[in-house]
Amino acid sequence: MTEADQFAATLAYATWPDKGMIVRGRRLTILTMRECVRPNETTQIIHVAEAIDPSAVLYTMGPKAVLGEQVDGKLVTAPEVEDGDALLPPGLYDGPVVPGPAVDYGYEMSTYRFETPGVHRIVWHLGDLVSNELLIFVE
């Protein structure tokens, strides 16, 4: 994905039709510019956390590792941290804590390559926050 593609995907978030469910004023959303790929082509996944409510906060310093991501029901990243705030990065965090409304694009992108045709499902879980289900069609 080029920088222009990344920028376009970031802009696309505002109008992305399928965002994650809001839980306690926050939500997770994943998006891509390539939902249809050929076998062995890559698709990159952009991760966005959003605080809708002023009482909800985001930890915007990044890039942050993506934890708790599943492809076709299998965990493919490091597991999520179980204790405390699901969006708080593991380890010592000494960055901005931003109240809502705010959007955090400061997560690393995931890159996937699928060999066989079909539909692949990607979901990002952090605590009780669950993203939208992103479908990647391999044709």
Model-assigned labels for residue ranges:
Residues 1-10, 19-111, 117-119, 124-126, ...:
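Contiguous segments within soluble domain cores/interaction surfaces
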